[in-house]
Amino acid sequence: MFEKTGIASREMVMSVFPSIERINKGPVAVVECYQKIPCNPCETACPAGAIRVGDDINNIPARDEDRCTGCGRCVAKCPGLSIMIVDGSKSAKTVEFRIPYEFLPLPQAGETVVGLDRAGQPICEARVVRVTNPPAFDRTPVVTVEVDRAYLYDFRNIRTEA
């Protein structure tokens, strides 16, 4: 089905998600890259060496959740917008996601936005915590949102109402 729709199945999502124990320790990357393509900016961006593509640039990136510091440098560098950071250490009821967001207008901190699943369907409300857009991100802002834990494996993006 993925080949026709581009929408990852639950099994695919779970295969790339860090363990819940790691998520609860602090920020960690989720690399939702499911196809072999010639790409490695995530590997070169990672200062901890936690994302590896290897000698063949077509390899699917592998993330070492123990080495990942959750710095987020990989998020804005991924041309496929396939990486997000998840952090479950701040609350028992919510998780924070840092996602690439290349739409205008950018949301503002404190704003409530619509949380979307991988098919682009509304699933929840999300509270914008911050928006980061330094020149080093090369016009790929990263939006941090807080989402109810019930949507940990379903949340993928946001929609503003503007």
What residue ranges belong to the model's regions?
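Ferredoxin-like iron-sulfur electron-transfer modules
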Residues: 16-38, 51-70, 87-103
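Intrinsically disordered, low-complexity, charged/polar segments
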Residues: 157-162
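Short, charged beta-turn/beta-strand-edge "cap" motif at the junction between a beta-strand
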Residues: 82, 117-122
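Short beta-strand-centered aromatic/proline hotspots
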Residues: 121-135
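Short, solvent-exposed secondary-structure boundary/capping segments
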Residues: 133-147
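Short, well-ordered loop/turn sites that connect or cap secondary structure elements
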Residues: 106-108
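Local cysteine-cluster metal-coordination motifs and their immediate loop/turn environment
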Residues: 37-49, 66-81
